[in-house]
């Protein structure tokens, strides 16, 4: 198979995967609440994978908090998924000193598998109002970049 054909096929498969509806995920946050993607129909859902030791992750947390606060109860939900922690207490202690306004899940790669691959931290997945995965990014995201993406979408 030629390189061009393989590259084209890979690009098509990635595009197909990105536009596929996500299977409903089940996430339990640190407050004991259960979150399903289907619970948020009609809203954009940003799932952000991060770690307490990850400097780029920590840098993006204030922007994600501002994004959540600006859209809380309206058109967008943020769910943080803490990854690669030595114990749950490390994350809980972090949240006591640096509380986040949005739900935080104690994650692992089994939980991540429900949403998508996490090859680096931070990684974010954005689902539209119908539950379709419309964007993913390895590396930090900003409030401005998420809002610009949503504004440019025909679904907003």
Task: Give the location of each predicted region.
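A short beta-strand-turn-helix
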Residues: 25-45, 68-71, 115
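N-terminal signal peptide c-region/cleavage motif recognized by signal peptidases
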Residues: 17-19
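Hydrophobic beta-strand core positions in alpha/beta domains
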Residues: 46-48, 80-82, 125-126
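Bacterial N-terminal signal peptides that target proteins for export
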Residues: 1-9
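Structural microenvironment flanking redox-active thiols in thiol-disulfide oxidoreductases
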Residues: 58-98, 109-112
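Thiol/disulfide oxidoreductase modules built on the thioredoxin-like
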Residues: 93-101, 106-151
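Short pre-active-site segment immediately N-terminal to redox-active cysteine/selenocysteine motifs
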Residues: 43-45, 49-53, 120
